[in-house]
Amino acid sequence: KRMIMTRKNLILLLFSLLTLNSCNKHEGPELRFCENYIQNYCQGDLVLLSRSPDRPPQIPADPQTPIRNFWIELTDCEWISPESDPQEFERLAIRNGDVGYNRWLEFWEYPSAFADNFQTMHITSNADWDEEHPAGTLLDDILWAEFWSYADYIRSGYETGGGNNVQMLVEDLKADDMQMIRDYVIIYFTKTPTIDPIHTLTVEWTTVEGEVKTASLTCRPQVNAKE
């Protein structure tokens, strides 16, 4: 009888634990009911990385190493969330029209974005790229931008699938394309330099408020370089 009671108690204990885990899954910190889709905004200084942020070293010591693309990120990022800065978070959410999501989100899928929205991007080099692109002239027509934007999804009333992958030449980017951007941008080279092989590239990214954010990277651009 004692053995039977022990087994029964064990079964009840296991059932209670399963029930408790189920409740935690819906009520715990890993799942939260969110009024806003974007849950984290990043505010910081612009930085250019020659490798993916997930693949160190991010900036090789040797600029002779050929690269086929570079990443635009923020360094010393200050994360703005409903917990860290409720007032600023609310201001950004209202600015973006992101105030009616009202759905459950798991912690690992919380969307993050640049705190700034942008109106123009321009990229130059300190060296001669080719005959059409001497030092100091815009390279916007030979650089390809790729990034994720949440703007269409939010503006559609959260009906279009989570956002859209923006892919176009830098010269074709408009202000509407550079709103509510996920927290990095990748720039690909579409031409390998034919004059000077080493370039210090400078990105000038202007916010909708008119602030110009700049960053530079010395590198060896090469279209067919290994990732």
Whereabouts are the PLM-identified features?
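C-terminal motif of bacterial Sec signal peptides marking the signal peptidase cleavage site
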Residues: 20-22
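Sec-dependent N-terminal signal peptides
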Residues: 10-18
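Elongated, non-catalytic scaffold/linker segments and compositionally distinctive motifs
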Residues: 6-8
